[in-house]
């Protein structure tokens, strides 16, 4: 991410800053507490088996500079942003960031062949443009926002893969 601050994240999510500096820059989003470093926003997702909020202390210990959380407990100097739903907030942040960029993005979806189609389109476009594309097969509700985290102002065109596991998810991803 480029030129994103805690204040931008507050605007994107309509969240509440519980503590920390709103002018702090954010360089990356991560849902993995083991990958947190300075200027990284840890996004704890509540899954079917695990509520990743339990990893907040580990994320802070590993240098986590800022957190997005659904719970109201906040301590220390790291910014905590309270939002109703962390997955939705991550998608809102990705949409906010994507809207700051002016490049066209091609979306690829379907039942079979998304990755191959995306790779073929990107390969052809790379002959003329600096292409931004889905990393691996990160095409989910979590993966697309994490992919957009790597978008830069140097990219000229994007090719993103979008997958779904529930009704309505392609609309959500397309809106990002």
Predicted regions and their residues:
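N-terminal leader/targeting and accessory segments in enzymes
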Residues: 1-92
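Phosphate-binding loop of NTP-binding sites
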Residues: 10, 90-176
